[in-house]
C-alpha cells in the first residue's frame, strides 16, 4: 500500500475532522481519481507522434492510455470528427496513490523555475487542475529517448464540496502551493 494512502488514513482524516467539524469519517474529503490528459494536435499530420505520446503517458502512469478523438470537425485546425488527437489516463486506487506520491515528492520539485503551484486552480467543487509543460520532469521518461517535449494536464478529482475543503485536503499532503 502507498505510504501517502496510509498517511491519509492515519493523519489527514483526523486533521480535517477537527478543522471542519465533521460528524462522520465519511464526510472527510478524499482523492477520488487523477486524470492525465495529453493533447497532441500535431497527430493530424503524423500518427507516430500520437503513439510516442501514448508511450510516454503509459510510462508515467503505469497504465495503457485511451486515445481521445475529436468530438466535432474544426476547419481552422484541419480536424475532422473522429480524428485521434490526444490520449488520457484515469488513475484510481493504488496506482492513483503511487502516482500522487511521485507527483508531490519527485516530479513537481523538478519543474524548471518552480515557485509553487497556484492555489487558484480549483474549479469551485474542490477539484484541482494543473498543467505541466514538459513530460521530462517524471523520472520514468528517459530524456535521451524523447522525440519531442510535450505537456500534459493533471486533474485531481476529490469528494470535497468546496474549494476550501479541497485546498485543505491537498495542503494536508504538503502540496506545494504558492505562498
UniProtKB/Swiss-Prot annotation:
<keyword id="KW-0820">tRNA-binding</keyword>
<keyword id="KW-0699">rRNA-binding</keyword>
<protein>
    <recommendedName>
        <fullName>Large ribosomal subunit protein uL5</fullName>
    </recommendedName>
</protein>
<keyword id="KW-0694">RNA-binding</keyword>
<dbReference type="GO" id="GO:0003735">
    <property type="term" value="F:structural constituent of ribosome"/>
</dbReference>
<dbReference type="GO" id="GO:0019843">
    <property type="term" value="F:rRNA binding"/>
</dbReference>
<dbReference type="InterPro" id="IPR002132">
    <property type="entry name" value="Ribosomal_uL5"/>
</dbReference>
<dbReference type="GO" id="GO:0006412">
    <property type="term" value="P:translation"/>
</dbReference>
<dbReference type="InterPro" id="IPR020930">
    <property type="entry name" value="Ribosomal_uL5_bac-type"/>
</dbReference>
<dbReference type="GO" id="GO:0000049">
    <property type="term" value="F:tRNA binding"/>
</dbReference>
<dbReference type="InterPro" id="IPR031310">
    <property type="entry name" value="Ribosomal_uL5_N"/>
</dbReference>
<dbReference type="GO" id="GO:0005840">
    <property type="term" value="C:ribosome"/>
</dbReference>
<comment type="similarity">
    <text>Belongs to the universal ribosomal protein uL5 family.</text>
</comment>
<dbReference type="Pfam" id="PF00673">
    <property type="entry name" value="Ribosomal_L5_C"/>
</dbReference>
<dbReference type="InterPro" id="IPR022803">
    <property type="entry name" value="Ribosomal_uL5_dom_sf"/>
</dbReference>
<keyword id="KW-0689">Ribosomal protein</keyword>
<comment type="subunit">
    <text>Part of the 50S ribosomal subunit; part of the 5S rRNA/L5/L18/L25 subcomplex. Contacts the 5S rRNA and the P site tRNA. Forms a bridge to the 30S subunit in the 70S ribosome.</text>
</comment>
<comment type="function">
    <text>This is one of the proteins that bind and probably mediate the attachment of the 5S RNA into the large ribosomal subunit, where it forms part of the central protuberance. In the 70S ribosome it contacts protein S13 of the 30S subunit (bridge B1b), connecting the 2 subunits; this bridge is implicated in subunit movement. Contacts the P site tRNA; the 5S rRNA and some of its associated proteins might help stabilize positioning of ribosome-bound tRNAs.</text>
</comment>
<dbReference type="InterPro" id="IPR031309">
    <property type="entry name" value="Ribosomal_uL5_C"/>
</dbReference>
<dbReference type="InterPro" id="IPR020929">
    <property type="entry name" value="Ribosomal_uL5_CS"/>
</dbReference>
<keyword id="KW-0687">Ribonucleoprotein</keyword>
<dbReference type="GO" id="GO:1990904">
    <property type="term" value="C:ribonucleoprotein complex"/>
</dbReference>
<dbReference type="Pfam" id="PF00281">
    <property type="entry name" value="Ribosomal_L5"/>
</dbReference>
Amino acid at each position: 500500500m502507498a505510504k501517502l494512502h496510509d498517511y491519509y488514513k492515519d493523519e489527514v482524516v483526523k486533521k480535517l475532522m477537527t478543522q471542519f467539524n465533521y460528524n462522520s469519517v465519511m464526510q472527510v474529503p478524499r482523492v477520488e481519481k487523477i486524470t492525465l490528459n495529453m493533447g497532441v494536435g500535431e497527430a493530424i499530420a503524423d500518427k507516430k507522434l500520437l503513439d510516442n505520446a501514448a508511450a510516454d503517458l503509459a510510462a508515467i502512469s503505469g497504465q495503457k492510455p485511451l486515445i481521445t478523438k475529436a468530438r466535432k470537425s474544426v476547419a481552422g485546425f484541419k480536424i475532422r470528427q473522429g480524428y485521434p488527437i490526444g490520449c488520457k489516463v484515469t488513475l484510481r486506487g493504488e496506482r492513483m496513490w503511487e502516482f500522487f506520491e511521485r507527483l508531490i515528492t519527485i516530479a513537481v520539485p523538478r519543474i524548471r523555475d518552480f515557485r509553487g503551484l497556484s492555489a487558484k486552480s480549483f474549479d469551485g467543487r474542490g477539484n484541482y487542475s494543473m498543467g505541466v509543460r514538459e513530460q521530462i520532469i517524471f523520472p520514468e521518461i528517459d530524456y535521451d529517448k524523447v522525440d519531442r517535449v510535450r505537456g500534459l494536464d493533471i486533474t485531481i478529482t476529490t469528494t470535497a464540496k468546496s474549494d476550501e475543503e479541497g485546498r485543505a485536503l491537498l495542503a494536508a499532503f504538503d502540496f506545494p502551493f504558492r505562498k
